[in-house]
């Protein structure tokens, strides 16, 4: 991940509805959530949610799958791990013991997404 890619990702999360959407999808895990359900839970019109889904998708934070007439969105956990790793690269001036809990969490996310 380079700086421009990180900025695109962070800008996508820098809006309240998109951040809430992303967090709900993280909580939902691999099952994901239907677009209509997310719009309803967040109290956002479906056409507005469509724009938010597009921004999150372009940032590679979520993916979608059409299931009949419904669209299910899922979080891209490997992208979450990638951006988190980018943000903490070189953490704590090389004193890795200070960052160990965070590094272990990232490793757990990466392991879960590669399985």
Language-model-detected regions and their locations in the chain:
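Amphipathic alpha-helical dimerization/coiled-coil segments
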Residues: 1-5, 26-27, 77, 81-115
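Beta-hairpin "wing" of winged helix-turn-helix
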Residues: 58-67, 74
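N-terminal helix-turn-helix DNA-binding core of bacterial DNA-binding proteins
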Residues: 4-45, 70-80
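Hydrophobic alpha-helical segments
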Residues: 32, 37, 59, 71, ...
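Short, hydrophobic-biased segments on the C-terminal half of alpha helices
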Residues: 53-54
